[in-house]
Amino acid sequence: MSNLSNLRHKLQNGLIASCQPVPGSAMDTPEIVAAMACAALAGGAVGLRIEGISNIRAVRRATDAPIIGIIKRDLPDSEVRITPWLEDIDALSAAGADIIAFDVTCRERPVSVADLYQRARATGCLTMADASNIDDGLLAHHLGIDFIGTTLSGYTQAIVPTEPDLALVTQLAQAGCRVIAEGRYHSPALAAAAISAGAYAVTVGSAITRIEHICGWFCDAIKQCETEKLTEY
């Protein structure tokens, strides 16, 4: 089995932990990101999704587990944020990413999806498409991109849904894609549902690594209960 085939096999039917702290938060340091990554692996995660060069370097020093690397940028002339530039591809590979993920949505972008894919292939890394719908995913699949993620489903519109897009997982899987289900998988039951729907692997982020979000969910539920109690009187 080749190294790339072995890497694909490691992810199959597994959990990928996205260790991306809230920007500027108390957890937002490379050392803490690396610690979160190691803790996730100790809990059974088979891979990691890491943003930023310094974070990827820190995680790579701590583990040889598969890393999906991304760089997020806020561009003045494009809504594309995830790994938009060719130099990002080179930097991610040099930092130690095994898989390079990039936005494949049909939006104005500084570099074409095809060019990003070709540059990533040239580094020897595997590739992952962050798609928003079936058209994005199929375009990426036909280009030859290794993994198709549902990462951006619901995030290219004004109102973000609360539930994950399991229907998109099924559509892509039926089209022959290696689907990485990602986006709003906030419970073990939803992660299992993604595998049942045909996902190759499932990425979970906020529910594992964003303490602020998790605490917020509990606080909101408690406040809702308090409100309901008050309306009874």
Curated annotation (Swiss-Prot):
<dbReference type="InterPro" id="IPR007260">
    <property type="entry name" value="NanE"/>
</dbReference>
<keyword id="KW-0413">Isomerase</keyword>
<protein>
    <recommendedName>
        <fullName>Putative N-acetylmannosamine-6-phosphate 2-epimerase</fullName>
        <ecNumber>5.1.3.9</ecNumber>
    </recommendedName>
</protein>
<dbReference type="InterPro" id="IPR013785">
    <property type="entry name" value="Aldolase_TIM"/>
</dbReference>
<keyword id="KW-0119">Carbohydrate metabolism</keyword>
<dbReference type="InterPro" id="IPR011060">
    <property type="entry name" value="RibuloseP-bd_barrel"/>
</dbReference>
<dbReference type="GO" id="GO:0005829">
    <property type="term" value="C:cytosol"/>
</dbReference>
<dbReference type="GO" id="GO:0006053">
    <property type="term" value="P:N-acetylmannosamine catabolic process"/>
</dbReference>
<comment type="similarity">
    <text>Belongs to the NanE family.</text>
</comment>
<dbReference type="Pfam" id="PF04131">
    <property type="entry name" value="NanE"/>
</dbReference>
<dbReference type="GO" id="GO:0047465">
    <property type="term" value="F:N-acylglucosamine-6-phosphate 2-epimerase activity"/>
</dbReference>
<dbReference type="GO" id="GO:0019262">
    <property type="term" value="P:N-acetylneuraminate catabolic process"/>
</dbReference>
<comment type="function">
    <text>Converts N-acetylmannosamine-6-phosphate (ManNAc-6-P) to N-acetylglucosamine-6-phosphate (GlcNAc-6-P).</text>
</comment>
<comment type="pathway">
    <text>Amino-sugar metabolism; N-acetylneuraminate degradation; D-fructose 6-phosphate from N-acetylneuraminate: step 3/5.</text>
</comment>
<dbReference type="GO" id="GO:0005975">
    <property type="term" value="P:carbohydrate metabolic process"/>
</dbReference>
